Amino acid sequence: MEEHYYVSIDIGSSSVKTIVGEKFHNGINVIGTGQTYTSGIKNGLIDDFDIARQAIKDTIKKASIASGVDIKDVFLKLPIIGTEVYDESNEIEFYEDTEIDGTHIESVLEGIRDKNDVPETEVINVFPIRFVVDKDNEVSDPKELIARHSLKVDAGVIAIQKSILINMIKCVEACGVDVLDVYSDAYNYGFILTPTEKELGACVIDIGEDLTQVAFYERGELVDAESIEMAGRDITDDIAQGLNTTYDTAEKVKHQYGHAFYDSASDQDVFSVDQVDSDEHVQYTQKDLSDFIEQRVEDIFFEVFDVLQELGLTKVNGGFVVTGGSANLLGVKELLQDMVSEKVRIHTPSQMGIRKPEFSSAISTISSSIAFDELLDYVTISYQDNEEFEEEVIETDKDTETKSSGFDWFKRKSNKKENDEVAPEAPREESYEDRENHLEDEQQTEGKAKEESKFKKLMKSLFE
């Protein structure tokens, strides 16, 4: 069985994370990770290019060693900053009976990219909401259907400021890897929700170091997404000021004794901290600490509620899903549940090695990559049962179950080309299976050329 790897990079404000994974039945098997803490990122953006580049390079190396994979190509997640979310439609026509395949789907989606009229932005994700075959046949996946006249798509679109996109890609590719594609967290978050949550209307709250990102899904699709410049760093600042100690000490205390729900915090758990303006050590209880934490986390949630109100939402029937590094704090779920009547849960990836909320974005980037590979029908994987990995698998939505792998597809096509140059086969009569395989190879080669040229075209357009 050939190996098909996906590599995702999550450039966060406090650390850079890399995950190497593979599609395994209905889930993802993580085979290697890397994480490097850095000061080169601020508010989700590159603040110091050299420091950020070194952190990215280090985490790629760690993931490569852990997985045994020579990482050459990656999928990059992008934050919800300078981002626009809107709906668009496009249609392509046929002049004879045509069996729809991945190339037709790619063509109708690419046409939406060309319609972007938001100044200084680049469309990074176009995700289909529904397809319509021959004007009146609405389907979720048109592949293998026969169209006589047309294929239309109604899609959601995510666009981001070009400067943000190009600087992130430039920094990653300066580490000696190629960015195959990028996925916004706004789209990625759909893969941490259950189908029921997405249908009823659910709000994802990702509390990171500098940013809290909010995405709302309803009727199975992304409605909108925003970011709030208030997050874990603000919690630590409040602790440092309230306890009259240094930021580093406040950060350690937060992780060791922090509790976001005052009513559940302990007044028996005692710790001491150094003071900034003296040599004195002052003792505090977890309840004292919780007083500062709860106020700030409440403020973050109130900001989230403001975002939802701006969207005209008064009810979140599918509930709230909290994730990100600051979701590790005890009491976060209890505090939010005390503030709302809807269901609240903390999302933590269940794969071995990444069972922390801060890995949600990186692993869901792989889910996004797999979903688009299936949609565009890039490559077919023959699965084999292997019970040894069952504990490391997280179930993904059945809607996004796939048999494709973008990363290895590029690797396979490259190897095939090299082999063809060395030992071309003599002409022979093709069987039906041969013709099918040949057609598939041509489609894959065409797709590869489009993918490889995407960001080169972007680079060129920035200077026109």
UniProtKB/Swiss-Prot annotation:
SMART domains given in the database record: FtsA
BP-aspect Gene Ontology terms: FtsZ-dependent cytokinesis
Disulfide topology: none
Keywords annotated in UniProt: Cell cycle, Cell division, Cell membrane, Membrane
Superkingdom field: Bacteria
Compartment(s) where it occurs, according to its Swiss-Prot or TrEMBL record: Cell membrane
Main location: membrane
Residue ranges with Basic and acidic residues bias: 416-455
Ranges where the record places region Disordered: 392-464
GO CC, alphabetical: cell division site; cytoplasmic side of plasma membrane
Membrane topology field: Peripheral membrane protein
Pfam families: FtsA, SHS2_FTSA
Quaternary structure note: Self-interacts. Interacts with FtsZ.
PANTHER family: CELL DIVISION PROTEIN FTSA (PTHR32432:SF4), CELL DIVISION PROTEIN FTSA-RELATED (PTHR32432)
Protein function: Cell division protein that is involved in the assembly of the Z ring. May serve as a membrane anchor for the Z ring.
Record-given protein name: Cell division protein FtsA
Organism this protein belongs to: Staphylococcus epidermidis (strain ATCC 12228 / FDA PCI 1200)
Gene: ftsA
